[in-house]
Amino acid sequence: MFRTMMNGKIHRATVTEANLNYVGSITIDSAILEAVDMLPNEKVQIVNNNNGARIETYIIPGEPGSGVICLNGAAARHVQVGDVVIIMSYGMFTSEEAKTHEPKIVVLDEKNHIEMILPEEKAHTTL
């Protein structure tokens, strides 16, 4: 049996752009992607902390160090520039792999630079 587990998480990302006329996806600073082991074209879930919206799309890598978090196409309807979002990727693991899997989690500052790398996410973690 395979289990779907969180593989990477970008916490407290601030939306820098929303481009309705782009074909689709989310553009993410590639330095952030590397830190959480996310790849171009990988499916991600985005949760908007400001309005509660949850959407799925795929990744386009942005300029490293730019701090870009840009929702494109229809996804742009679910955010406004300045909204704080959580971006998560998932992987499928065997039951044995799932027991030892450790997702990569980063917390960003208000300019979308990595502020902290969390070794684990415990119950009732608040920042």
From Swiss-Prot:
Please tell me one Gene Ontology term that the record gives under cellular component.
cytosol
How does this polypeptide assemble, per the annotation?
A: Heterooctamer of four alpha and four beta subunits.
| Keyword Transmembrane among UniProt keywords | no
Indicate the residues that form the catalytic site: S25, Y58
Family stated for the protein in its record:
Belongs to the PanD family.
Give the cofactors, semicolon-separated: pyruvate
BP terms from Gene Ontology = alanine biosynthetic process; pantothenate biosynthetic process
Q: What does this protein do?
A: Catalyzes the pyruvoyl-dependent decarboxylation of aspartate to produce beta-alanine.
Known catalytic reactions: L-aspartate + H(+) = beta-alanine + CO2
Task: Report if keyword Lyase is assigned.
Answer: yes
- Where substrate binds, per the record, is at T57, G73, A74, A75
Q: Which residues carry this modification: Pyruvic acid (Ser)?
A: S25
Its pathway, per UniProt, is: Cofactor biosynthesis; (R)-pantothenate biosynthesis; beta-alanine from L-aspartate: step 1/1
Any idea of its EC number? 4.1.1.11
* Protein name, as recorded: Aspartate 1-decarboxylase
- UniProt lineage: Bacteria, Bacillati, Bacillota, Bacilli, Bacillales
Q: Which domain of life is it from?
A: Bacteria
Which InterPro entries does the entry link to?
Answer: Asp_de-COase-like_dom_sf, Asp_decarbox
Top EC class for this record: lyase
Task: Summarize what the UniProt record says about post-translational modification.
Answer: Is synthesized initially as an inactive proenzyme, which is activated by self-cleavage at a specific serine bond to produce a beta-subunit with a hydroxyl group at its C-terminus and an alpha-subunit with a pyruvoyl group at its N-terminus.
HAMAP family named in the record: PanD
Q: List the disulfide bonds.
A: none
Q: Which UniProt keywords apply?
A: Autocatalytic cleavage, Cytoplasm, Decarboxylase, Lyase, Pantothenate biosynthesis, Pyruvate, Schiff base, Zymogen
